Regions:
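Short, well-ordered coil/turn segments that N-cap beta-strands
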Residues: 12, 37-39, 80
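Short, small-residue-biased leader/transition segments that mark boundaries at the very start
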Residues: 2-6
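Active-site ligand-binding patch in enzyme domains
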Residues: 32, 42-45, 49, 53-156
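A short alpha->loop->secondary-structure connector
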Residues: 8-9, 103
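A glycine-rich helix N-cap at a beta->alpha junction
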Residues: 11-18
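Low-complexity, intrinsically disordered short peptide segments enriched in small/polar/basic residues
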Residues: 9-11, 121
Length: 156
């Protein structure tokens, strides 16, 4: 407030909140975090006409059209991380990366409470190429879990 007065005293017009909405649209992630101290989260999902996330046969790979798939690539490029549950990983074996040449892929995050992610999944096989986090809640140790941890520790 005092700075505004000093500036005004020098004959400079001070306009508060000038083009605020336009400025907020330039970087919504930053402004959201600064004002709320919470992460900016975007949820994307696809749904069939009957409100399901897969067809009656269980197929879920292409229930969206090409424009929606292009927007997904833009979203993946724009944001810092992409998260999927283990159910999606087991059903679809996704890559969770950006497929546009020259665009940066986000950190891939898999929520997997029991560490069921297959070692031959695309996510595990490509972990050297794309930063990947698998979050799990288990306390137990077995040979498979130890192997998955070793793979994770040798990756990025």
């Amino acid at each position: 407030r005092q700075r505004q007065m000093c500036i005004r005293d020098r004959g400079i017009t001070v306009v508060r909140d000038f083009m605020r909405e336009e400025c907020d649209r330039l970087n919504p992630v930053f402004f959201h975090y600064i004002t709320t101290k919470t992460p900016y989260v975007v949820m994307k999902y696809a749904m069939t006409l009957d409100g399901k996330i897969a067809t009656k046969t269980g197929a879920s790979k292409w229930i969206t059209g090409e424009p929606a798939r292009q927007e997904v690539q833009h979203m993946r490029h724009r944001y810092m991380g992409i998260m999927a549950g283990i159910g999606t990983v087991l059903a679809d074996d996704p890559m969770l990366n950006v497929r546009v040449e020259g665009w940066k892929s986000p950190v891939r995050i898999v929520c997997d409470s029991s560490l069921r992610i297959p070692l031959d999944s695309q996510i595990v096989r490509s972990a050297k190429e794309y930063r990947t986090i698998v979050a799990y809640a288990g306390q137990e140790e077995n040979e498979e879990i130890t192997e998955k941890k070793e793979i994770a520790l040798t990756e990025k």
